[in-house]
Regions:
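Low-complexity, serine/threonine/proline-enriched polar segments
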Residues: 90-141, 300-312, 319-320, 328-332, ...
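An active-site-proximal "capping" alpha-helix that borders the catalytic cofactor pocket
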Residues: 167-180
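Non-catalytic terminal regions of proteins
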Residues: 1-60, 69-73, 192-446
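Post-HEXXH active-site segment of zinc metalloproteases
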Residues: 53, 69-111, 149-154
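Short acidic alpha-helical/loop segments enriched in Asp/Glu that coordinate divalent cations
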Residues: 182-194
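Active-site-adjacent bridging/hinge elements
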Residues: 136-153
Length: 446
């Protein structure tokens, strides 16, 4: 099932075209025991061995990707543009620019793999201790963007674009480690302490590896600004921020850009980013700037509710206070919930019009079944039974059945759409990966 557009693949991945998941680490030998595990209550579960911990946390990682793609405004935008590209350019056989519109979203994922630079692998083994700086660059294919530089003293170790891939992978990592922590907390005291220490060691080992910068960049940046957060607090805080950013409407992103433009020193490139945000793109820049702004927020006396303890104890309350005090201080009447509601309805209507095309039914069923419950609880607080999911491929094409599965035969779904999938894949491989953007020279006003 290997495709051009997919999440990072260590032990599994989600295919961005079909929204299918493959667990590439395991085959049919784990099917029976895993399907039994998936029916258990995660709030009381205790892992009996390393395999149980690995497979459950891996599944929570991958279904986070699926849910981000099928329940958030960003995911609905991505899939709506994908389906319009299929309808208007592939099925109609017309030479239209629908692929360029689709690539607005695709490119914001792809910039990580296209532009990341590792300059010194010998010094890139302790990234968390590195000094971080950021600067803006212009790329002829992707436009203006933010690069994060890692330094060991004066030596540049790595330069990493801040991308949508980092948001998606950080959200999945949060789910993966939070489910491990939850189950460890169900253990007896002595074993619990050992398990939590091993989980923390695994996490900070991940943070220090340059090979996993798509996973660890946001955590490193957040931990450096809020060093007092323990692991669970850090994971939940990052998840709260990412969930919020993934569900921003285009109007909200545009509104936030009016504040962000005043925070950018390099106005030549910064104004081009602001222009991009004014059309609802570059939402990953919102996350980057929010982390910096929140650091400023908690250190300013003019605000009443900027209690840093809320980041630890109730990050949703902290985010709400940050929006109501800090953002609204600079942007009057910022809260635009009605814009999100309207945008959501537009995407749902678009999917309903394409109901027989590729994965429209899958996206609609997931969104209508899962979006509400995910607005009330974190994924790691939910059992697999609570969520409507597609079944999952294992590495030998056997199928891992979800206990509350969407009524789609994934093998048949893949085979029926194989010609279409291959044509999409070919088009993406044979055309330049390009984001339609405004050149900094052409920005007249923001």
């Amino acid at each position: 099932m290997q495709r051009t557009l997919k999440t990072a693949n260590i032990n599994g991945y989600l295919d961005f075209i079909t929204n299918l998941i493959e667990i590439s680490k395991y085959n049919k030998n784990i099917k029976s025991v895993t399907e039994n595990l998936l029916t258990k209550d995660i709030q009381t579960m205790v892992f009996t061995d390393k395999f149980e911990e690995n497979i459950i946390s891996l599944i929570y990682h991958e279904i986070t990707h699926f849910l981000d793609m099928t329940t958030t405004l960003w995911g609905l935008e991505y899939n709506s543009r994908k389906l319009l590209f299929i309808k208007n350019q592939i099925l109609s056989k017309k030479k239209l620019d629908a692929i360029d519109v689709f690539k607005l979203n695709v490119s914001e994922i792809e910039i990580h793999n296209r532009l990341i630079q590792i300059y010194d692998t010998s010094q890139a083994k302790d990234l968390f201790s590195a000094n971080l700086k950021h600067h803006l660059v212009y790329d002829k294919n992707f436009g203006s963007l933010v690069m994060i530089d890692f330094f060991n003293q004066e030596n540049l170790i790595a330069s990493v674009p801040f991308s949508m891939l980092s948001l998606l992978e950080s959200n999945a990592i949060s789910s993966e480690f939070l489910i491990r922590i939850n189950c460890a907390l169900n253990e007896e005291q002595i074993k619990q302490q050992i398990s939590l220490k091993l989980i923390e060691d695994d996490f900070y080992n991940l943070l220090n590896k340059y090979e996993f910068l798509e996973y660890n960049l946001i955590f490193i940046l957040t931990k450096k600004h809020f060093p007092y957060l323990n692991l669970k607090e850090l994971l939940i805080f990052v998840k709260v921020l990412i969930d919020y950013v993934l569900n921003l409407s285009a109007m909200e992103i545009s509104s936030i850009s009016t504040l962000i433009k005043h925070t950018i020193i390099n106005q030549y490139l910064g104004n081009a980013i602001v222009k991009d945000m004014q059309r609802g793109m570059s939402r990953h820049i919102v996350l980057f700037k929010f982390i910096l702004m929140m650091y400023e927020y908690i250190h300013q006396d003019k605000f009443k509710f900027n209690n840093p303890d809320d980041i630890k104890n109730n990050p949703k309350i902290f985010l709400k206070n940050f929006i109501n005090e800090y953002i609204s201080y600079y942007i009057k009447n910022f809260e635009l919930e009605i814009a999100s509601d309207i945008e959501y309805k537009v995407y749902i209507q678009s999917l309903e019009k394409s109901i027989d095309m590729l994965d429209s039914k899958i996206i609609l069923e997931s969104c209508q079944s899962n979006r509400d419950i995910l607005s009330k609880k974190f994924l790691h607080e939910l059992n697999i039974m609570d969520i409507k999911l597609l079944n999952i491929f294992l590495n030998d094409s056997s199928i891992l059945k979800m206990p509350n599965s969407i009524n789609v035969n994934i093998e048949q779904y893949f085979e029926n759409n194989l010609d279409l999938i291959l044509e999409i894949d070919k088009l993406l491989k044979t055309t330049d990966m390009f984001k339609f953007h405004i050149h900094p020279n052409d920005v007249t006003y923001v």
